Structure formats: structure tokens, C-alpha cells
């Protein structure tokens, strides 16, 4: 997948509005929290978080996506610390209060396990993880995401990956989403919100 090519198209591939999941769950985030939006794309989620008053940093590996994200932030009149980076290159030693990871299912099982380990490292004690993506049946729907069931999430997988964390919300459901041309139609979805132990 060449994300720079995908994001070079005119307009916003996933729209300008935040993911419906994030709109529903953002109230859990403490005011003024240090938030990291992972593989943020064109900025729809990070910009929304900044409008809520959070200290937001975000990264994506696509030059075109980051440029569009900066334009979206300027349009909204907010500041986001945008960075050009992939998950593997990001400095996870600088802890944040909240990690937001939405539709990052371009990784297979091995890379995903490494990413989840980075999340466990990069989140401050007592911090929140807001994770949202597709369930394996999404491959049959074909309305977004890669055509690889092994890249998708299940709730047992996520409970295992973040064992010992307090699960605040989890759901496995189908819904009609309209989030730009990239995510459009009936979809098999997973929500997972958990708090890292404070100790």
C-alpha cells in the first residue's frame, strides 16, 4: 500500500470529521491531556482532539497526509504537533496520557504485536488507550480496510494484549459508517477502551 499515492488525491480520503467512535468516547479524556494520535492520516481525529483543548501530537508516514492534516488544523484554528513518522520510528519513550489508534490495520499479526508493545511502553501509568478497528468479518463486507482477516481485531486478542488493564468499554458490532470514501458502508467493528494500571 502506497499511502502517499492514496493521500495525493484531491479531497480527504476519510473525510474531515472525526471517527464516530472517537466522538462517542472522547469525553473519557481528561481536560488538557497529552494525546498521541497514531498513524493519524489527514488529521481528522487529531484536529478534533485539539478542538477539545487537548495537547495533541500526531504522526503519519505519508508526506501528503501530514500536509493535509496541517491544512485541516489551520482551517480549524488549532495547533497539533504533526510529525512525519511510522510506528516503528516513533519515540515511544516520551509518555503520553492517551493513545488514540483508529483503523491502523495495515499490519499483520507480528507487527501488530510489536505495535501493542509500543503502546504499553508509550502510555503513562493510569493513561487511556482508545483503539478502534475492524473485526475479521470486515473482509466479507469489503467496505474499508485491507483484505486480510489476520490483520483484524477480536476482543479476546485485545484483552490478552492488554492483560491487567482496566477495560472501560469494549464492543464487537456492525454499523453503517460514512467516513469519507475510504470507510463507507456496513462494517464489522471493534471498540476497545482501556486504562493502564497506575502503579
Which residue ranges define each predicted feature?
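Conserved class I S-adenosyl-L-methionine
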Residues: 1-30
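Conserved SAM/SAH-binding beta-strand->alpha-helix loop
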Residues: 62-64
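Conserved SAM-binding loop
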Residues: 69-70
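Conserved SAM-binding strand-loop segment of SAM-dependent methyltransferases
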Residues: 75-88
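A short acidic, Gly/Pro-enriched loop at the edge of an enzyme's catalytic core
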Residues: 90-98
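A short, conserved alpha-helix within the catalytic core of class I
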Residues: 106-119
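Conserved beta-strand signature within the Rossmann-like core of class I S-adenosyl-L-methionine
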Residues: 126-134
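Short alpha-helix
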Residues: 150-171
Amino acid at each position: 500500500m502506497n499511502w502517499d499515492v492514496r493521500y495525493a488525491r484531491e479531497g480527504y480520503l476519510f473525510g474531515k470529521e472525526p471517527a464516530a467512535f472517537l466522538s462517542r468516547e472522547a469525553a473519557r479524556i481528561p481536560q488538557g491531556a497529552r494525546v498521541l494520535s497514531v498513524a493519524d492520516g489527514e488529521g481528522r481525529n487529531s484536529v478534533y482532539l485539539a478542538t477539545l483543548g487537548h495537547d495533541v501530537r500526531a504522526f503519519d508516514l505519508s508526506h501528503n497526509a501530514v500536509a493535509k492534516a496541517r491544512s485541516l488544523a489551520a482551517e480549524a484554528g488549532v495547533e497539533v504537533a504533526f510529525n512525519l513518522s511510522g510506528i516503528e520510528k516513533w519515540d515511544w519513550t516520551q509518555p503520553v496520557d492517551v493513545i488514540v489508534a483508529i483503523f491502523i490495520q495495515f499490519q499483520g499479526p507480528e507487527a501488530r504485536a510489536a505495535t501493542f508493545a509500543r503502546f504499553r511502553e508509550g502510555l503513562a501509568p493510569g493513561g487511556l488507550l482508545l483503539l478502534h478497528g475492524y473485526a475479521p468479518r470486515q473482509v466479507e463486507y469489503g467496505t474499508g480496510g485491507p483484505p486480510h482477516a489476520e490483520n483484524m481485531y477480536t476482543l479476546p486478542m485485545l484483552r490478552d494484549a492488554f492483560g491487567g488493564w482496566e477495560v472501560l468499554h469494549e464492543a464487537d458490532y456492525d454499523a453503517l459508517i460514512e467516513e469519507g470514501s475510504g470507510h463507507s458502508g456496513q462494517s464489522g467493528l471493534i471498540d476497545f477502551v482501556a486504562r493502564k494500571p497506575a502503579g
